[in-house]
Amino acid sequence: MKADIRVNGSTKLIGVIGNPIKHTVSPQLHNTLSSNLNHNFIYIPMLVNEGDVGAAVKGLRALNFTGFNITVPYKNEVIKHIDEISEEARLIGAVNTVKNDGGVLKGYNTDAAGFAASFKEQLGMGFEGKRVAILGAGGTARAIAVKIAMEKAAKITIINRTAARAAEIAELLLKELGIRAEYIDSASKGVAAVIQDVDIIVNTTSAGMHPDVDNCPLSQENCCFSPGQAVYDVIYKPEETKLLKAAREKGCIVSNGLGMLF
């Protein structure tokens, strides 16, 4: 649906900064929502060049933007240019949403909350008391791991090709949140045992994303799923990745990451 946008002197300014920015669908979603709900705001995509994040934030503050989102590659860098961040954002080490509260810029991370809401809605379970395996150790993995830990999972295992990055997340979860956390190299023979032992598996890697649809974050011998396990893939294109197909065929409940967008 095309957004019917009317701008006047009372229109609130909201936007998103990043580089590149042409790919973002956020303006279409937010402006359509504004129009449909008769809210008086406009959402603007803004390209910010490398080295200009501080100047951009200063300008958004001066222009009295109600708030703004941050996309790649500035979710980490923006932190040093705002006034406060939430505890969850501090642990994740990234901010994707900033609210202007009377001139005070407060940073939040809603990526993890979007994942948790989508997971619970699609798969019908929470994380408390669950054993979880997370595939990958990038920014998305860290955000999801922190969220799952904050919701009192029993144990989290990070599976990644680079052990050092996985170890960093595991150490964070143990030190800051007191959650039993481990890590394992994705090439290790112990991966199969981890997959068999957990209640929930979350893929945060790009393995299997279009156009590389024949790829899978787990080798065939490690796709040893059990009926009733929950398998969530943050990828949503294709709708069913090779990982999800293998899990579904073994009797798991599965979901892609499309719900994280809403």
Predicted regions and their residues:
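Short, conserved loop/helix-junction motifs that constitute active-site signature segments
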Residues: V7-N8, F127-E128, K152, L218-G228
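Conserved Rossmann-like nucleotide-cofactor binding loop
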Residues: K22, A164, K237
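Active-site capping/gating segments
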Residues: A117, E121, Y236-K237, C252-F262
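Rossmann-like adenosine-cofactor binding region
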Residues: R180-S255
